């Protein structure tokens, strides 16, 4: 397959709109082009993604890569798109199964060695993802924040290789369990007791 579509989320205030990362691998001079109104941190992800893919034991395609971040009119910022871009490249180049990312959304920054680094805005992203009835794959340090939502499937990984093994079903990640939230708090002091 020379085309892949991976789902992720952006951040727009408290909202987390859906972003489609479309990757097309074609013959031609080796290059990587990102279109769809990416800001500087997203454009810089080219080098992080290339190194992370190579250092995780995969091949970086020596072909022409075009990556579209849709919708094009929504600004994309931050490094949270590294993981979905890397997975799109691996699926489009045939290194991961074609439909392995169905019903999943991905978020996370990649280090040069393939480690996943935490990102901000996870609760907003998790709420939007749950609303669309998708599962979420994110960096391990972000798992506790995302698993506060009831009836929501969250998977956490610490390395790109772990994510790929899960998607290839060679070593599946355990679903992060929801943390029960105690809503019965008793406070000795009450603002109603304040006088003056």
Report the location of each language-model feature.
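Peripheral, non-AAA+ core regions of ATP-driven protein-machinery
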Residues: 1-196
